[in-house]
Amino acid sequence: KHDLGRHCLLARRLLESGVSFVQLSHSNYDTHNENFNFHIEQLAEFDFAFSTFVADLAQRGMLESTLIVVLSEFGRTPNVNLYQGRDHWSRAWSVCLAGTRMPRGHVFGATNDKGTEVIDKQVDHGNLFHTYLQSVGVDSTANFNIDGRDMPIADPASRPIDGLLV
């Protein structure tokens, strides 16, 4: 019914054919005005397509070998602006992980009551990257060689998210 649903179906077919990485996009969440009216439609489309995609992979036995990551480059302000929108907010936002080695129905970390600050288990992009790699069986502490020079696969100062992978 929607482009995202068709793209999820194509992604599943690509994964079935052996493609190892697929990226989907669902854009236009940058709602500085009319946030609520727009998101009623936008989130309904995402919710149906995403939940169907996850169920589809699980039904085919592919979820245990597929990592699904849903994220944005920043969050939205906890408060509504003058135009009934939400602006950019970099201090706290959510990431959804599903599939290989990810616990089902698990909430990791917390924000304060206003959603403005992380108060428990704050992580950064380095932690996420290590976690992604480890979840698909790549040793995130290993190196790879570029023209005779060893380079770390991931930031050596970072590590996977403690207690997340099962």
Each model region followed by its residue ranges:
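Ligand-binding pockets and gating/stacking loops
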Residues: 1-166
